[in-house]
Curated annotation (Swiss-Prot):
Pathway: Cofactor biosynthesis; NAD(+) biosynthesis; NAD(+) from deamido-NAD(+) (ammonia route): step 1/1. Gene3D superfamilies: HUPs. The gene is nadE. Belongs to the NAD synthetase family. Mg(2+) binds at D52, E165. It catalyses: deamido-NAD(+) + NH4(+) + ATP = AMP + diphosphate + NAD(+) + H(+). This is NH(3)-dependent NAD(+) synthetase. Keywords: ATP-binding, Ligase, Magnesium, Metal-binding, NAD, Nucleotide-binding. NCBIfam families: nadE (TIGR00552), PRK00768.1 (NF001979). It comes from Salmonella agona (strain SL483). ATP binds at G46, I47, S48, G49, G50, Q51, D52, S53, T160, K189, T211.
Length: 275
């Protein structure tokens, strides 16, 4: 088995999907989890206005609405969380995503004060954060807020990670990577677009340039610029297609060096890092 085949198998990626079937699969997955643990009453997700959170948010709201109808439990709710750092550049996209999702509840937590306070406390301890590390601080502060909300609402934190993100480790460890349940796992980027199109999402929300937008020095830096490959390259790789060897090596390089992000804390029984 080639490394490409191993990666595809590990991430559960498929070359072709039926969007309607995958929508149903994700919704049923979320419902089944909540049914298994009836003390859980909410799904909590940060909404950025980008493709991934818009899709995960819509699937979460659908799952909650169906489960509420089936069980008669009106305590069930989907909580969409706005998590801007100061003013958000693409605020209108975020509002459009909220309008499309129609969440039961919307909360806004501006993380800027918390991030700056943490940065100042570290500075007083003699640690000056780089812009890159500050970006990770933002991602972790956003996740901290979501878990606080989930803790107070008997909730589960929903993740937006998918195969095209997982393969490159393009997420912050214990930030946007630290979630409870990931309904998009297995899908590549273009497949996520297919699901949103099938759900009637406004096109501009899934055709916009993907960006983590974490760094102050490089605002709205496109994911593809940070990775050195395009999402089309990554999707083609995950679909088993043959790529230019340099591109394939770049993707595989990201996969190998970010393996630690796809695992729980390393123990004495783990040896993947020795390879």
């Amino acid at each position: 088995m080639t490394l490409q085949q191993e990666i595809i198998q590990a991430l559960g990626a498929k070359p072709h999907i039926n969007p309607e079937e995958e929508i149903r699969r994700s919704v049923d997955f979320l419902k089944a989890y909540l049914k298994t643990y009836p003390f859980l009453k909410s799904l909590v997700l940060g909404i950025s206005g980008g493709q991934d959170s818009t899709l995960a948010g819509k699937l979460s709201q659908m799952a909650i609405a169906e489960l509420r109808e089936e069980t008669g439990d009106n305590a069930l709710q989907f909580i969409a969380v706005r998590l801007p750092y100061g003013a958000q550049a693409d605020e209108q996209d975020c509002q459009d995503a909220i309008a499309f999702i129609q969440p039961d509840r919307v909360l806004t937590v501006n993380i800027k004060g918390a991030v700056l306070a943490s940065e100042q406390a570290l500075r007083e301890a003699g640690i000056e954060l780089s812009d890159f590390v500050r970006g990770n601080e933002k991602a972790r502060e956003r996740m901290k807020a979501q878990y606080s909300i989930a803790g107070m609402t008997h909730g589960v934190v929903v993740g937006t990670d998918h195969a095209a993100e997982a393969i490159t480790g393009f997420f912050t460890k214990y930030g946007d990577g630290g979630t409870d349940i990931n309904p998009l796992h297995r899908l590549n980027k273009r497949q996520g677009k297919q699901l949103l199109a099938a759900l009637g999402c406004p096109e501009h929300l899934y055709k916009k340039v993907p960006t983590a937008d974490l760094e102050d020095d490089r605002p709205s830096l496109p994911d593809e610029a940070a990775l050195g490959v395009t999402y089309d390259n990554i999707d083609d790789y995950l679909e088993g297609k043959t790529l230019d060897s340099a591109i394939a090596k770049t993707i595989e390089g990201w996969y190998v060096k970010t393996e630690h992000k796809r695992r729980l804390p390393i123990t004495v029984f783990d040896d993947f890092w020795k390879k």
